[in-house]
Design a protein with these regions (language model features):
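Charge-rich, intrinsically disordered N-terminal extensions
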Residues: 1-207
Length: 207
């Protein structure tokens, strides 16, 4: 499943089967109840069996919150995020695969992007244009949220782009890196950055 030659060639990973374990390439806590281990076809994924903390509160991913037309694509991406090392490390990052807790947080930030696409009449990741990403950037920058939240919202789009060659063509973002590969610190750090329209405001309900 994680054949490095396939990854190097940009070959998409084969579709998981309905009964493929969600935590296929993760260590499972030996004390976890096997009945609580999710499979790919389920719309709620329990990530708790992959943690080794004592008395951990159950957590996971709820795909029923994702617009129906995006659900299959988002499940495919997050299954890769859980089980496959990132083809490219995030700028400033130190890991190739996120901790499961971090994946839960990534799901929330990425969900805001998906809902924004849906609200704006963009009917799939393959239909996203560079102009759409520029508009999302502008609205995130103008949103009345913290800089850290803005960094998370933009960073998850960049992370998704980094997995594009492992995904089917119809759920890939454009080949050019989002925002021409600009460092998020540059995008977020200078309120007077030229050429960025900050007038529109992203709906905070989307976030």
């Amino acid at each position: 499943m994680t054949n490095p030659e396939a990854i190097a060639a940009g070959t998409p990973i084969p579709d998981p089967l309905p009964d493929t374990p969600v935590l296929l390439n993760r260590s499972i806590n030996p004390e976890a109840d096997p009945e609580t281990c999710s499979v790919y076809a389920q719309d709620r994924w329990n990530l708790t069996p992959g943690t080794f903390e004592s008395h951990v509160e159950a957590f996971g991913l709820n795909f029923t919150a994702v617009p129906a037309q995006y659900r299959a694509a988002v499940k495919r991406y997050f299954w890769c995020l859980i089980n496959i090392d990132a083809p490219r490390r995030q700028r400033g990052g130190t890991v190739r695969r996120l901790a499961l807790r971090s994946i839960q947080l990534a799901f929330r930030a990425f969900g805001a992007f998906v809902r924004w696409l849906h609200t704006n009449g963009i009917h799939g990741f393959g239909a996203v244009r560079r102009e759409d990403l520029e508009r999302y950037l502008s609205e995130v920058l103008a949103a009345d949220v913290s800089v850290n939240t803005k960094r998370d919202l933009l960073g998850e789009v960049v992370r998704f782009w980094g997995y594009r060659l492992l995904l089917p063509e119809d759920i890939r973002l454009p080949a050019c890196p989002p925002w021409d590969g600009a460092d998020l610190r540059d995008l977020l750090g200078d309120p007077a950055t030229p050429g960025v329209n900050r007038t529109p405001r992203i709906n905070t309900d989307t976030i």
